[in-house]
């Protein structure tokens, strides 16, 4: 089967690991011919070009900046991406035909492109639902429901669902939400934020070097948050956790990431002057994976205002590494149901700091701490292996 995969991520090096890298590589491994269309931002010196990576054709498309820019510019530039992708596909892929077109949200602005490609190739269309926009922006009060920008993006969202033959959501709540708020005719299924299994083992010498480099106390438990630091993660709540982290016994907090509020988080840590709190900018993946191996408990944060069920992708690596999960999210995300029902962690709503402190201390003292670790890995093994998820996807498309 010839597969066209459209994404906003930069997938130039498919020898790397990640949600989308592994997704594309597993399709290729199963014998399908995959072409990736991937963004290349202007600020990074992006150029439109067709390359081969790990045996897969990758069409890099130069786009205007959609990261590290203002909210307005990001919105305008996102609307323009469809035009850039259409032009590049016509120029570089005009002699090809595809049986299946797979695309992700974000963005929701590819409806015309997908519709045209679907007609041209008589292809099946599959949406990987990773984001429910524009409702998430309404939840965070970035704009109002009666605004023209909301109406514009909402129309595009509806059209994208309408032209999709199949929709794979990250969790049951994802699928339920779009069905309850839209007319969905597509076949639906759960496709997790899945990855190949990694070996999260760190050699003793590497452990010592990392401990010294970061400046952590090896006698204390490490709570790790890694990922984006922006409005969706509930920055004020994260700062409240930092302010009261001294109430968590014999522990240290390690925050690694980037985003619009990284400097805010970093500044707050400096004001607190708590030697048990470290804030670092984003690390290379191989080094960050070693930090995961070194840590004891993985943290998940989401803003409590969300009415849409987000499902952070950073959970996957933590489960794979067998790390108990302490999650503070909105009540609509079913990440809480997965970690609680599978005995792999604890949850509280992210407007309750007392309960977070209580859960953290409870987890540390629990006789079941080792069981939490074992259950975390078992949840990865059951739900988050890329091989199983690609098999599910291909089975649905074949029927």
Predicted regions: what is each one?
Residues 351-355, 367-397:
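A charged, aromatic-enriched C-terminal amphipathic alpha-helix characteristic of glycosyltransferases
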Residues 4, 217-233, 238-242, 254:
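Conserved donor-binding/catalytic core segment of Leloir-type glycosyltransferases
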Residues 109-112, 116-120, 148-167:
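Membrane-proximal helix-turn-helix segments that form the acceptor-binding/catalytic region
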Residues 14, 233, 284-291, 298-319, ...:
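Nucleotide-sugar-dependent
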Residues 1-57, 245:
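N-terminal subdomain of nucleotide-sugar transferases
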Residues 248-250, 256-257, 262-289:
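Nucleotide-activated donor-binding/catalytic signature segment of Leloir-type glycosyltransferases, i.e.
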Residues 48-51, 201-216:
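A short helix/loop element that forms part of the nucleotide-sugar donor recognition site in Leloir-type
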Residues 40, 173, 194:
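Carbohydrate-associated surface elements
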């Amino acid at each position: 089967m010839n597969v066209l995969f459209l994404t906003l991520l930069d997938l130039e090096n498919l020898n790397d690991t990640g949600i989308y890298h592994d997704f594309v590589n597993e399709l290729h491994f199963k014998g399908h011919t995959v072409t990736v269309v991937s963004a290349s931002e202007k600020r990074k010196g992006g150029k439109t070009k067709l390359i081969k990576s790990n045996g897969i054709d990758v069409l890099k498309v130069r786009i205007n900046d959609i990261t590290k820019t203002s909210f307005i510019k990001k919105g305008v530039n996102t609307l323009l991406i469809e035009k850039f992708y259409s032009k590049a596909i016509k120029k570089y892929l005009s002699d090809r035909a595809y049986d299946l077109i797979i695309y992700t949200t974000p963005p929701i602005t590819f409806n015309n492109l997908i519709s045209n490609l679907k007609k041209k190739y008589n292809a099946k269309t599959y949406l990987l639902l990773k984001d429910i926009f524009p409702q998430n922006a309404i939840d965070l009060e970035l704009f109002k429901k009666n605004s023209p920008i909301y109406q514009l993006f909402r129309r595009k969202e509806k059209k994208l669902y309408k032209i999709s033959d199949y929709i794979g959501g990250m969790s049951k709540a994802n699928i339920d939400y779009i069905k309850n708020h839209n007319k969905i005719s597509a076949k639906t299924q759960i496709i997790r934020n899945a990855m190949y299994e990694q070996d999260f083992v760190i050699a003793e010498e590497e452990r010592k070097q990392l401990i010294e480099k970061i400046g952590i106390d090896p006698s204390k438990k490490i709570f790790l948050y890694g990922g984006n630091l922006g409005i969706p993660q509930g920055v004020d709540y994260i700062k409240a956790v930092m302010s009261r982290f001294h109430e968590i016994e014999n522990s240290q907090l390690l925050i690694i990431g980037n985003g619009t509020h990284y400097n805010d988080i970093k500044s707050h840590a400096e004001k607190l002057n708590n030697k048990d709190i470290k804030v670092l900018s984003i690390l290379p993946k191989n080094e960050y994976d070693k930090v995961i191996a070194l840590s004891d408990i993985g943290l998940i944060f989401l803003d409590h205002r969300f009415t849409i069920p987000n499902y952070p992708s950073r959970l996957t690596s933590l489960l794979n590494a067998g790390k108990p999960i302490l999650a503070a999210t909105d009540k609509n995300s079913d990440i809480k149901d997965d970690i609680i029902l599978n005995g792999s962690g604890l949850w509280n709503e992210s407007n309750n700091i007392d309960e977070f402190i209580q859960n953290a201390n409870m987890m540390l003292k629990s006789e079941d701490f080792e069981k939490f670790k074992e259950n975390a890995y078992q949840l990865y093994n059951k739900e988050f292996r890329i091989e199983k998820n690609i098999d599910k996807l291909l089975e649905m498309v074949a029927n």
